[in-house]
Swiss-Prot record:
Protein name stated in the entry: cAMP-activated global transcriptional regulator CRP
Name of a matching Pfam family: cNMP_binding
UniProt keyword annotations, A-Z: Acetylation, Activator, cAMP, cAMP-binding, Competence, DNA-binding, Nucleotide-binding, Transcription, Transcription regulation
Gene coding for it: crp
Record note on quaternary structure: Homodimer, which upon binding cAMP is able to bind DNA. Binds RNA polymerase subunit RpoA.
GO biological process assignments: establishment of competence for transformation
């Protein structure tokens, strides 16, 4: 287990990089968007509704999730500043939303209709590269997640999830690593296990001096 938190450094850090490396083309794109501010826990996308709009996170973070027929929620990912979402309908005209998207924190979101975005592509095809580059990285991350589900035990999945979260923009620098805020239930929804199991694994990681947990606050030692 001691290697699981140190060997996971290849996971997603793109949202941090993109948030601090704004490109002039991206700034041009944002001038054509409608900008909105949302409080935490606002629902931006409902699964099953028509897909007509592309979103871009300027500040804050959002949670992407799905629900089974019984209403049980599974957290698919968190997206932070510099990330697009709601793009599937852009390539599959007439499709319905397949997931729920809610703000995790207070957010500033840029929104643009698919029709307008396609017009921008005609004016400057480079704007499409921002989106396709992210989609390529997400596909890699999804492949990694599937591999983890197949080969890592639940303790390994939780350890990797904590390291992933420690690399998100809203994670706070701590003298011993990075500090995150997340509930046991949310972790369970991300890795596919019960809240009680998460609690036991968190305690085990603490005993191994890999993390420190107090309520929703978790310090991941050695993460930067």
């Amino acid at each position: 287990m001691s290697n699981e938190l140190t060997e996971i450094d290849e996971v997603v850090t793109s949202s941090q990089e993109e948030a601090t490396q704004r490109d002039p083309v991206l700034d041009w794109f944002l001038t054509h968007c409608h900008l909105h501010k949302y409080p935490a826990k606002s629902t931006l996308i409902h699964a099953g509704e028509d897909a007509t709009t592309l979103y871009y996170v300027i500040k804050g973070s959002v949670m992407v999730s799905s629900k089974d027929d019984e209403g049980k929620e599974m957290i698919l990912t968190y997206l932070g500043a510099g990330q697009f979402f709601g793009e599937a309908g852009l390539f599959d005209e007439g499709s319905k939303r397949s997931a729920w998207v809610k703000t995790k924190t207070t957010c500033e979101i840029a929104e643009i209709s698919y029709k307008k975005y396609r017009q921008l592509i005609q004016a400057n095809p480079e704007i499409l590269m921002f989106l396709t580059a992210q989609l390529a990285r997400r596909l890699q991350n999804t492949s990694r997640q599937v591999t983890n589900l197949a080969f890592l035990d639940v303790a390994g999945r939780i350890a990797q999830t904590l390291m992933n979260l420690a690399k998100q923009p809203e994670a706070m620098t701590h003298p011993d690593g990075m500090q995150i805020k997340i509930t046991r239930q949310e972790i369970g929804q991300m890795v596919g296990c019960s809240r009680e199991t998460v609690g036991r694994i968190i305690k085990m990681l603490e005993d191994q001096n890999l993390i420190h947990a107090h309520g929703k606050t978790i310090v991941v030692y050695g993460a930067r």
